[in-house]
């Protein structure tokens, strides 16, 4: 078979700012956290309760839990899981697992029973660390997933409903008076050892278990500490996050922050006033958000009440952010732009990131160090040059080891040459900025035309009466699919279906008109990270409009 690769059209990331350091992900985290512990730095702050955890306290508890897990009988290749909403204790089992070479599978108590049975059935953990909120579901799942031997309560100092608290689990499984300083991290084969089992986004069915190695994680740490693609390492810097920790975006930004000595200020639920007050009170220099929250901030009438002069960066990830909303929010916060990143669970974290001082409206960024990317033609699979749309493919040391017990699905996404096919449509310009247009599977096929929902969503969001919108294809026997939209109107505003359709028709080419109709809804269906749920939108659009 002829080699279709044209090297001129492969985009390479730069050399890393710092070489990747020796040791497992656990060994590196312990070394960094020990350094910040000696400085007295704060690791986590719960902005709602005011509770702080210093690096010294967090490291001590994580090391003691690591020792307890070893004494319980977990060895390299063992498995533990979490089932919890964001809480300040969330990363203690994560760190403990990384310290001893045990794979960690994070889930969230918001999962349905079916999703949790599926997810924990893939990772087969021996121990599940559950929040009090998640306990009932985990107890039920244990009846089906027999690998689960022990349930430990993550967010309680005392035993709860007959289940051991994490503190008491540590006491029971470590010698009296044991100190974290005596704990020894376990060395592992970095390239092979699974560090985390994350859930794929599951946009085409139930999620798959994504195996990420210690090599994947330490490469991510080098990006987190890179002053151009990550952060200036400055212990004590306060960063506000409202991103779910169980998700790849929340997991790897937070672990990266711990390597930098940052104070991670958490908001366990989003409320506009509390959010702005927290930014002010903790003098946060950066905030990390999912796109859903940008629309709220863009229309906020409270911004001027607060002193946000310390804020120098807003970062977005977890789902695509429209160019218009990003620019509008940046203007409102007096910032040059919004820092974006693009990645998949299968690529560990973002592999395209806005470099410091090099943002371009609408772009996701440039290829990170140690990675390369290309755009291929959807039909011929040939590598394309600048400004030509195709499927984005990437290659580098953060690609997953594979899906758990699913070699067939692994081969479908990573080809024989080691390129991961993202399933996203995009292009890059002459300056090597990448633009992600839409999901390949989301494209609406109308009479042979390919219509990207994200483009129509962006058009809808520019209308002053429209607060939020989502677009999907409605099956049609003649055209294949018809573009349709669900729309949330601004408070106090009104529009008819025809007015919305006429507005879109005035902005787009003929094939992109909303022939599938418009439905007015209270909320656009979205996942936890703000990804629009096309399947749910399709179901809404299929239903007949209720007659008054």
Curated annotation (Swiss-Prot):
Cellular component terms (Gene Ontology): peroxisome
Keyword Repeat among record annotations: no
Classification via PROSITE patterns: AMP_BINDING
Reactions mediated catalytically: firefly D-luciferin + ATP + O2 = firefly oxyluciferin + hnu + AMP + CO2 + diphosphate
Entries under CDD domains matching the protein: Firefly_Luc
Cofactor needs: Mg(2+)
Keywords assigned by UniProt, alphabetized: ATP-binding, Luminescence, Magnesium, Metal-binding, Monooxygenase, Nucleotide-binding, Oxidoreductase, Peroxisome, Photoprotein
Short sequence motif Microbody targeting signal: positions: 546-548
Pfam family, one: AMP-binding
Function in brief: Produces green light.
Annotated family: Belongs to the ATP-dependent AMP-binding enzyme family.
Name recorded for this polypeptide: Luciferin 4-monooxygenase
Provenance organism: Aquatica lateralis
